[in-house]
């Protein structure tokens, strides 16, 4: 499925969660898309992704179909939690039939992670499009 998407669209960036089972997927994708990057979802990475997404959303730079309840549920499933050590904060989503592990939200946040911080809602940077099928 990933290879078909790269053949159909002009894919510029692929980031794969390599924390667990994704390591195998990452190795397979690297064979046909060498620029793919692996990402370990540490507490620091999750925090960076969430804070960046909040910044983009608050600035009015994220638009999506209001009828896309799957994406909405996915974002709403992510909650701030104390880490196992009790000394830090992380973000996580419990498994649910509606939102999974918030995979759509994490995918969207990965795309937003490459959005420039200085971009503005009035066009300070080029427009990016993320399509989820």
Predicted feature descriptions by range:
Residues 1-43, 47, 51, 55, ...:
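RNase H-like, metal-dependent nuclease domains and their acidic two-metal-ion catalytic environment used
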